[in-house]
Each structure stands twice: as structure tokens, then as C-alpha cells.
Amino acid sequence: MNNQQSRGALGTSGATPDLPDATPGLSRNPVGGHVPVAGGLHSVGLAYARDLAAEAVQVFVANPRGWATPAGNPRQDEEFRAACAAESIPAYVHAPYLINFGSHTEATVEKSVESLRHSLRRGREIGALGVVVHTGSATGGRERSVALAQVREHLLPLLDELTHDDDPYLLLESTAGQGASLCSRTWDFGPYFEALDAHPKLGVCLDTCHIFAAGHDLTGPSGMHQTLDLLVDTVGEGRLKLIHANDSKDVVGAHKDRHENIGSGHIGEDPFRALMTHPATEGVPLIIETPGGKEGHAADVEQLKKLRDG
């Protein structure tokens, strides 16, 4: 696939794609954003995406800072799924932030199981290709190995429940390295994947701000490519399924999760251009989670497209 094979953004016509794994017929890297859905997954979320000229979308299906597991609106679900399919728009779900399978608190772990199961089920209902979940931390002063054993105990059964052809992938997103994080550097994905038997429905969502804040310097002529090489060496080819394209307000290794608009932070534009030339990112969508509201989001989507196509 090359840039000349790109299809249009939301609001243009296109062929219905096969949804399971790849995004056939799309540009090398579809660029889109996380969109608000309060008031309607289709009527509000996709309307916002159209205003961004988004080629990919990410949504919440529950309050990201709570444990509620609301049922979807069947009409909105079907309209969203149909529009994404008809217009070749890959969609993703971001699971709630409170989920932590490494917690020392039994209630938190139990709620994490139900919350993620809900996100995975809702992901299938709306035709999402993947559900993003943060990798969590080892709370209560426990060893990382103990927390990872607990991750295995509770998360592996959820992966084994993904038996339908249209079930989404579970995409692990590393953190900026705050506290007792279970996964922040590229090599931390290794023990996490081992704990989950490198399950076939397991993938990675790479957040550029997080990995930069954790200590991977993405700047310079080869910083981004070296980081992606390390990731592939750790988890294998084909596991990178989604990229959260965010600049960073803070310097490399600051362990602060503060996103900035593309080119306005300490990462800068060039690493994002390099990102979209590495073999591991072929066909992988980019989702922005940057400041500035709709105007800022639209500018970031446009900027990433220019870096991709220029």
C-alpha cells in the first residue's frame, strides 16, 4: 500500500472493507482522533470526526473515570458501525482509565475485569478493530512479578473469551513511567506478553508522548526508528496495531503524561514523519489525543497528513 491508494476521510464514499485485522484500501497511515460521543455515538461522534477530516476514530463507550458499564444505543451502534464500514474508517475503543489488573485491592481488580469485559463487548457491537487499555501498575509495594502473575490470572481469561471473528484486539498501552508502572519502556512489553502467553488477540498501542516521557528519545535522525526496532524485537512483527500520536509538553524521561499539539512540544515534527516510514507502522492508524478542542484537533490531523503525504 502507498499514499496514492489513500481513500477519503469521513463524509466521502468508499468500499466496505474487511474489518478483522488489517485496513485494506486505506492510506499507509490513516490519521484521525479521539472524538466525543456524549449525545450519540454516530450523531455526535462521527459528526465531530467529519469536522476533523478524520480517517480513523477512537471513542469511549463508558465514563473513562468511572466503573459504570452502560448499555449501548442499538440504533446509534448500527449507524456508527455501518458508516465506518461504508466509508472505510477504522474505529477503536479506549477502555476506562481506572482499570488496573496489577492492583493490590481485590475490589479494583474485580471491577477492572467487568469494565474491560464491557469495553470488549461494546467494541464488537460497534465494529471496533481494537480496545486500548493501560497496562497498569504494581500497587501496594508489591514486586512486579507478583503483579504480572495477577495480570495473567485475570486478563488471560478475558482474551480467551474473544472467540468471534469480529472480536476486537486487546491493545496494551504503556504509561509514561510514573510510580510502579508495569510497562513503560519498549522492553517492558516482553514480560507482559509472556504473562499473557503472547495471545493471538493481543496487540500494542504505542503512545508517542508516553514512550518519550518514559525515556525513549524519539528525536534525532534515528530516534524514532530505533525505538520502533526495539518494540518489534520485543513483541514481534505485526503486534503494533494502533499509534496514539501526541507530542510532549515535557522533556524526554520526565515521566509526565502531558500531551502537546503535533510539532509544538519536545518531540517535534520530524519524528512523526519518521514514524510513518518505518516498516512496523505500515497500515497502522494514528489517533491524536492532543489539546485545543476541535480547532486544535483538526490542525493536528491536517499536520500529520502533510507529514505523511509530503
UniProtKB/Swiss-Prot annotation:
Keywords per UniProt: DNA damage, DNA repair, Endonuclease, Hydrolase, Metal-binding, Nuclease, Zinc
Residues reported in the UniProt entry to bind Zn(2+) 2: 173, 207, 244, 289
Annotated segments matching region Disordered: 1-31
InterPro entries named in the record: AP_endonuc_2 (IPR001719), AP_endonuc_F2_Zn_BS (IPR018246), Xyl_isomerase-like_sf (IPR036237), Xyl_isomerase-like_TIM-brl (IPR013022)
Catalysed transformations (reactions): Endonucleolytic cleavage to 5'-phosphooligonucleotide end-products
Gene3D superfamilies given in the database record: Divalent-metal-dependent TIM barrel enzymes
Pfam families found in the cross-reference section: AP_endonuc_2
Keyword DNA damage: yes
GO terms assigned for molecular function: deoxyribonuclease IV (phage-T4-induced) activity; DNA binding; DNA-(apurinic or apyrimidinic site) endonuclease activity; phosphoric diester hydrolase activity; zinc ion binding
GO biological process, one term: base-excision repair
Enzyme class: hydrolase
Co-factor binding comment: Binds 3 Zn(2+) ions.
Entry EC number(s): 3.1.21.2
Keyword Zinc: yes
Protein name as annotated: Probable endonuclease 4
Provenance organism: Streptomyces avermitilis (strain ATCC 31267 / DSM 46492 / JCM 5070 / NBRC 14893 / NCIMB 12804 / NRRL 8165 / MA-4680)
Designated gene of the protein: nfo
